[in-house]
Design a protein with these regions (language model features):
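C-terminal hydrophobic helical "lid"/dimerization subdomain
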Residues: 2-23, 273-277, 316-370
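Glycine-rich cofactor phosphate-binding loops and adjacent beta1-alpha1 units
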Residues: 4-7, 184-189, 212, 228-308, ...
Length: 370
C-alpha cells in the first residue's frame, strides 16, 4: 500500500496534478528546511470544524521565524501558513454561521468564543485555539485547511470581493493596528509617533495610525526602497538609520524630547534598544516584532521617565472594524502587496520574501490555483 501511495504522489508531482482526496502543501521539515509535498485533504474532526478550500494565501515574517527555529511549538511535518481567503468546502454539524460555497477570510487566530480568555477578548490565548494555524495544527499554505471553531474564526466576505486585499486582514493589518497603534496609545490625536521598521508590519502600522490623525509619523529603516513606500503612504519624515543617527534626528525633530509613541516592528535587540532612546518622558513603546533573542531593558535610564512598554500577540478583535474600513475604502491593503506567485512557485516566493532588501518585497500573494 505504501509503495502504491508513493507511486501516486510521484505521478502527481510529475504531472503537476493532484488526485482526488489529496492536495499540495508547503511543509516545515525542521530548522532551515521546507518542501512542497502531496498531503491528504483534511477532514472534519470536530462538530465546530470547517474545511476551507484556500484561494489565496501569503507568507508572514513569523513563517521565517519558524524556519529559523524561533518557534518551538511548530514541529517538523507541519503545513505552514496562517493567513488566507477561501471557500467553505465542508462544515461540521455544529457550524451554524457558514455554508459550503461561502467565501471567507481566515483569521490567523482561532477562538472558541466561550473560554475565560475569549470572554475577555484575549483570543490569542483561547484555551482551545489562539495562534495554532501553521504552528500547532496544519495551516493555510495548502489546497485545503481545517479551521476549528469556524463560527468564531472565519469572516464572511462578499463573493465579488478582492481576495488579495482581504488576505491582508488575516494577520498583518490587525497585528499592526492592535499590537502597535492601539497598544501604543496612538489614538490620541496630534501625538508624535516613530515606527522602527518599514516592512509590512511597520507600513500597516503607518496606514492604521493615520485613522487617528497623529501630529507626526516618523519611519525608521535601513532600506531606502521601503522608506520611499512609507513616504508615499503618508509618513511625514523618513530616516535611514544606516546613514543617520536616528536618535539624534528624532531629538532634532521633536525639540529634544523624543516621540510620544514608538512602535517596534522589527523584532531584533538592536531595534528594541533604539526604541528605548526615542521615546519621550510619559511616552509608550509598543513592541510588535517577534523576538527570537533576549533584549536588554535599560531600566537604569527608563525607571524615572514614566515610560510604558507593551507587548501583545494579536487578538483579531479589530478584524470587523478593518473589514468595514476596507469596504468603505478608508484603507487600501493593495499598498502592502508587492509580488504575486502561483503556488507552483512558492519556494521562489519564500526566497523573494526572505531577501526583501534585495527584491523590494513587502507582502507576497500566493494563488493556490496556480
Amino acid at each position: 500500500m505504501e509503495e502504491r501511495m508513493g507511486e501516486i504522489l510521484t505521478a502527481a508531482r510529475d504531472a503537476a496534478t493532484v488526485p482526488s482526496g489529496l492536495m499540495n502543501a508547503l511543509v516545515y521539515r525542521g530548522q532551515g528546511s521546507k518542501q512542497v509535498e502531496i498531503r491528504p485533504k483534511p477532514e472534519i474532526q470536530h462538530a465546530d470544524d470547517a474545511i476551507v478550500k484556500v484561494l489565496k494565501t501569503t507568507i508572514c515574517g513569523t513563517d521565517l521565524h519558524i524556519l529559523k527555529g524561533d518557534v518551538p511549538t511548530c514541529t517538523p511535518g507541519r503545513i505552514l501558513g496562517h493567513e488566507g481567503v477561501g471557500l467553505i468546502d465542508d462544515i461540521g454539524a455544529g457550524v451554524t454561521m457558514f455554508r459550503p460555497g461561502d467565501k471567507v477570510l481566515i483569521s490567523c487566530i482561532t477562538s472558541c468564543g466561550k473560554c475565560e480568555y475569549c470572554r475577555r477578548g484575549v483570543y490569542s490565548h483561547c484555551l482551545t485555539g489562539g495562534w495554532i494555524l501553521g504552528n500547532e495544527i496544519d495551516g493555510t499554505q495548502a489546497g485545503y485547511v481545517r479551521i476549528p471553531c469556524a463560527d468564531t474564526s472565519l469572516y464572511r466576505i462578499p463573493q465579488g470581493a478582492d481576495e488579495d486585499a482581504f488576505v491582508m486582514l488575516s494577520d498583518v493589518l490587525p497585528t499592526a493596528f492592535e499590537c502597535g497603534v492601539l497598544n501604543g496609545k496612538v489614538e490620541k490625536p496630534g501625538i508624535s509617533v516613530a515606527i522602527v521598521g518599514s516592512g509590512p508590519i511597520g507600513l500597516s502600522a503607518l496606514l492604521t495610525a493615520r485613522f487617528f490623525s497623529p501630529g507626526q509619523i516618523i519611519m525608521i529603516d535601513r532600506d531606502d526602497n521601503r522608506l520611499a513606500v512609507a513616504k508615499k503612504l503618508g509618513a511625514d519624515v523618513v530616516i535611514n538609520n544606516a546613514a543617520l543617527d536616528p536618535t539624534s534626528e528624532v531629538k532634532k525633530i521633536t525639540g529634544g524630547t523624543g516621540v510620544d509613541a514608538v512602535i517596534e516592528a522589527v523584532g531584533t535587540p538592536e531595534a528594541f534598544e533604539l526604541c528605548e532612546t526615542l521615546v519621550a518622558p510619559g511616552g509608550c513603546i509598543a513592541n510588535v516584532g517577534v523576538h527570537g533573542r533576549k533584549v536588554d531593558l535599560h531600566l537604569e535610564k527608563l525607571w524615572s521617565q514614566n515610560i510604558s512598554i507593551t507587548t501583545r500577540l494579536v487578538d483579531t478583535v479589530t478584524t470587523n472594524i478593518l473589514l468595514r474600513a476596507v469596504e468603505m475604502k478608508k484603507i487600501d491593503p493593495h499598498q502592502l502587496i508587492s509580488h504575486h506567485f502561483p503556488f507552483s512557485r512558492i519556494l521562489t516566493a519564500y526566497d523573494t520574501f526572505a531577501r526583501a532588501s534585495a527584491t523590494g518585497a513587502l507582502k507576497v500573494i500566493i494563488d493556490m490555483a496556480g
